[in-house]
Regions:
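Acidic-basic catalytic patches of nuclease active cores, encompassing PD-(D/E)XK
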Residues: 1-38
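Residues at secondary-structure transition points
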Residues: 11, 15, 19, 44, ...
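Conserved catalytic cores of phosphodiester-cleaving nucleases, focusing on short active-site segments
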Residues: 28, 47-68, 77, 85
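Short acidic/glycine-enriched loop/turn segments that link adjacent beta-strands
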Residues: 42-45, 114
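Structural motif
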Residues: 44, 57-59, 101, 118
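Mid-chain, well-packed structural core segment of small domains
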Residues: 70-102
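Domain-level recognition of nuclease-like catalytic cores that cleave nucleotide substrates
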Residues: 95-131
Length: 131
């Protein structure tokens, strides 16, 4: 019984995330973004959405939540997640030989069915300067 509940919960979580990413793509396309890749992977590295916005490459992390009872979706993006996004972006840029300015955006999607609350946070974070 517990195993079934856990599997069902994980499936619902995955489905919600997928719907959130679908909504984010529609939102971006409506704003004129050209979607280059969704769920791009290279080994363990992964990027939710890579898009072109004019002359910039936008790397977009999508966070979807049922509600904000436990905080805002963007608060789930911590330093560790940012490091993973940066490493994944580096792999992406090298593979496709991208020579564009890069920015890192976040799109939050809140709700379980339309209409969702969607917020786009351009330039949500900058790569840290490591020594």
């Amino acid at each position: 019984m517990r195993l079934y509940y856990k599997i069902a919960t994980m499936s619902e979580h995955y489905d919600l995330g997928k719907r959130g990413e679908d909504e984010a793509v529609r939102f971006l396309q409506a704003k004129g973004f050209y979607i280059m890749h969704r769920n791009w992977r290279s080994g363990k590295k992964e990027l939710d959405i890579v898009a072109r916005d004019g002359e910039e490459l936008a790397v977009i992390e999508v966070k979807t939540r049922r509600n904000t009872d436990y905080g805002r979706p963007e608060d789930a993006i911590d330093e560790r997640k940012i490091r993973r996004i940066l490493a994944s972006t580096d792999a992406y840029v090298r593979k496709y030989r991208i020579d564009l300015p890069i920015r890192f955006d976040i799109i939050t999607v809140v709700g379980t069915e339309p209409p969702y609350e969607i917020e786009h946070i351009p330039d949500a974070f900058y790569p840290p300067l490591w020594r």
